[in-house]
Amino acid sequence: MNETKTDMLNYWIEELLKYFNEIGFEVNPLPKIVLDDTPNPEDELFIKTGYYDPTENKLVLFIDNRHIKDILRTFCHEMVHRNQNIVNPRQFEMSEGDMPLKDAPKLRMIEGEAFLKGNLLFRQFTERFTH
């Protein structure tokens, strides 16, 4: 694992967590955060990016062959899932798991919220440094 990349990720994850706290985005107790450097093919579209496991309160980010910004965007997406699990834990108990989104309206709702909020959180966070 590239120590510089890991150090940078850890730094920015800490900064994002501070930001979440500042804006009142509820994620505590924090999940265990795992940076997984399992090799990902460089030119493969369908690689694993990350996941949140509510039963273990664990968030895994796959970091090999990925830009730091992309990894942090995944982190924000998965932290929205953490927030969803805090605000409405039954949501996860009732979700359709690994079904295709076209067949899983509850999962589609959960994922839609995570994509929308996760990207907005990350954009607003980055704007603190660019505007």
What are these regions (language model features)?
Residues 2-58, 120, 124:
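Auxiliary, metal-adjacent structural segments of Zn-dependent hydrolase domains
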Residues 26, 89-90, 128-129:
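Short, polar/charged, Gly/Pro-enriched helix-capping and turn/loop motifs at alpha-helix termini
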Residues 58-75:
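Short pre-active-site segment immediately N-terminal to the catalytic Zn-binding motif
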Residues 69-73, 85-116:
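Post-HEXXH active-site segment of zinc metalloproteases
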Residues 76-84:
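Short active-site segment of divalent metal-dependent hydrolases/proteases
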